[in-house]
Amino acid sequence: ETGIKLANLFSLNDLITFDGDLGVGKTFLCKSIINNLTTINEVVSPTFNIVQTYPLQKDEEIWHCDFYRINNFEEVEEIGVFEDLKKKIILLEWPKFNFELGEYHPLNINIEIKKNNRSSLSELRKISLSGSKKWDNKIKNLHNFLAL
């Protein structure tokens, strides 16, 4: 449900970063967003390929990236992730280079497992959103919608 609500906020030229511990649900949330923005049924984790692309319309794409194994920003530039951003939505896990990403005005999504969770069947997550002024209205609307 959260992925559906998030997907409705995103448009071309958006960079969304996902941060949190291993196994917290970053890839799961990204897959949910991609499933809701495309007709793709099988979304593959970019853990080993670093980037997976999914078509939207015409020459527009969603880029799902995992920077866990990236060592420096030069490697990011070699891949071309930020080239022609106006034709992309970028979902980026493990944003190690936040200081380099400022010019792209990312929406930062941090996911944590809630402590003292009483549910034995599933773990609850805490999602925190932050970003530049570009995201202020969308974050406010999303907070109200999700009651974050």
Set out the residue ranges of the language-model regions.
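Short phosphate-coordinating micro-motif centered on Lys-Gly-acidic
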Residues: 82-148
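N-terminal pre-Walker A segment at the start of P-loop NTPase domains
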Residues: 1-5
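Hydrophobic anchor at the beta1->P-loop junction of P-loop NTPases
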Residues: 16-18
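Conserved nucleotide-sensing/catalytic segment adjacent to the nucleotide-binding pocket
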Residues: 47, 53-96
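The conserved Walker
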Residues: 22
